[in-house]
């Protein structure tokens, strides 16, 4: 017999839930029957007493309930979570294939019905981030079957590193921290929080302790290959390079020269290390500079040294409140890149902000092209790699826009 407390939701929340969206906001709750604490599982019902689903409740977050199931018969025991993990692993093994499975995103939150949980596999290390209070409480039920499941594919994990050092955790009532996860079924001494991965036949040192997000951006894996195919014989400017991934893929594709730019000293140092690791010097050089200032300077000088520019900025907005400023920022860098490129040059441009929708991004690019007095010939329009699956009924899972253009 089920003993979960009952959350009754209004018609607006019911309509969203019926489309498959897993979130219930605080203002959409009509009443709660029975005792509960943040992080508990609760059953969600309509005002007509129809079962909607079961999820984690939170009295701190604006999202009051995050659904994890719509089956009233689920028991949420160890076997339930193991099935979820096995399904996630099997999906990645299928869509990524054996070669790309050793460094990919294994769990992508709501897209895998494990809200607020991110797990990235970097060779012999799992890097995790937990943003949902309820998932944080039961994470061992996820971590252990992940490690056991990976071993069946011949991947042996030496440690799990938690990157819970993000302020957004506080919105769910969680504290910030980072460090190795300790459990009796894991090695006692996992070693340094560094590892090496191979992506697209290129080696990278990954700083899982201090690198951005979980240490390496896996979502651009196949977009980098698209850049590599176009880079042969080109002089490439890679802006916001982070660890140099686009730059190194351009070099591997046959670029004559590549300049990788980032404002972060640590990012430039890591890029230099990756250049040396792959023997791409002197083809690739890393430069510490403010990309906005550099693009302004090159545009004013009418510099024609580059015939391929890559723009992969961090998210300029993480909320709808700052979208207008973000729009201007995206337009500024794209406009300047279009002014710098010669006719027939190539532009790869991205946005990783969910709030900057594809429609807005395309509108911004059209405005930038009009202002620059150029036309854009689209070569490819792409999204995140399939280990970051997009659920059409959960729009928040669709966030990465990537376009390749020829400027004509």
Regions found by a protein language model. Give the residues of each.
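Non-catalytic accessory regions of SAM-dependent methyltransferases
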Residues: 1-123
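Non-catalytic substrate-recognition/targeting regions of SAM-dependent transferases
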Residues: 107-120, 139-216
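Conserved class I S-adenosyl-L-methionine
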Residues: 233-242
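Conserved SAM-binding loop of SAM-dependent methyltransferases across substrates and taxa
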Residues: 243-256
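Conserved SAM-binding motif I beta-strand of class I
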Residues: 257-262
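S-adenosyl-L-methionine
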Residues: 266-310
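C-terminal catalytic and target-recognition region of SAM-dependent MTase-like enzymes
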Residues: 305, 332, 346-408
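Mobile active-site "lid"/loop adjacent to the S-adenosyl-L-methionine
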Residues: 306-336
């Amino acid at each position: 017999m089920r003993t979960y407390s009952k959350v009754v939701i209004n018609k607006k929340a019911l309509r969203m839930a019926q489309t498959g969206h897993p979130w219930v906001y605080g203002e959409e709750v009509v009443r709660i029957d029975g005792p509960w604490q943040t992080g508990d599982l609760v059953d969600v019902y309509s005002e007509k007493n129809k079962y909607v689903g079961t999820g984690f409740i939170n009295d701190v977050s604006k999202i009051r309930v995050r659904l994890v199931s719509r089956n009233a018969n689920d028991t949420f025991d160890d076997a339930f979570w193991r099935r979820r993990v096995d399904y996630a692993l099997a999906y990645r093994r299928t869509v990524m294939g054996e070669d790309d499975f050793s460094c990919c995103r294994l769990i992508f939150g709501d897209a895998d019905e494990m809200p607020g949980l991110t797990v990235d596999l970097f060779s012999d290390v799992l890097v995790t981030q937990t943003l949902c209070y309820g998932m944080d409480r039961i994470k061992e039920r996820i971590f252990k079957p992940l490690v056991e499941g990976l071993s069946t594919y011949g991947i042996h994990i030496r440690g799990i590193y938690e990157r819970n050092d993000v302020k957004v955790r506080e919105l769910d009532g969680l504290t910030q921290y980072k460090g190795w996860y300790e459990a009796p079924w894991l090695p006692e001494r996992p070693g340094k929080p560094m590892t090496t991965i191979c992506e697209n036949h290129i080696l990278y040192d990954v700083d899982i302790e201090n690198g951005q997000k979980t240490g390496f951006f896996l979502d651009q894996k196949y977009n980098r290959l698209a850049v590599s195919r176009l880079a042969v014989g080109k002089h490439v400017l890679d802006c916001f390079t982070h660890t140099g991934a686009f730059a190194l893929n351009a070099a591997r594709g046959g670029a004559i020269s590549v300049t990788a730019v980032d404002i972060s000293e640590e990012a430039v140092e890591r890029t230099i290390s990756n250049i040396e690791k792959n023997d791409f010097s002197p083809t690739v050089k890393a430069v510490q500079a403010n990309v906005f200032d550099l693009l302004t300077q090159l545009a004013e000088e009418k510099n024609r040294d580059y015939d391929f520019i890559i723009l992969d900025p961090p998210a300029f907005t993480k909320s709808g409140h700052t979208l207008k400023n973000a729009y201007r920022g995206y337009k500024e860098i794209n406009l300047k890149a279009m002014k710098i490129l010669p006719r027939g040059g190539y532009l790869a441009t991205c946005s990783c902000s969910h709030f900057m929708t594809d429609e807005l991004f395309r509108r911004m690019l059209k405005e930038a092209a009009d202002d620059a007095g150029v036309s854009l010939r689209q070569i490819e329009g792409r999204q995140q790699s399939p280990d970051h699956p997009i659920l059409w009924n959960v729009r928040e899972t669709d966030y990465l826009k990537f376009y390749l253009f020829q400027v004509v």
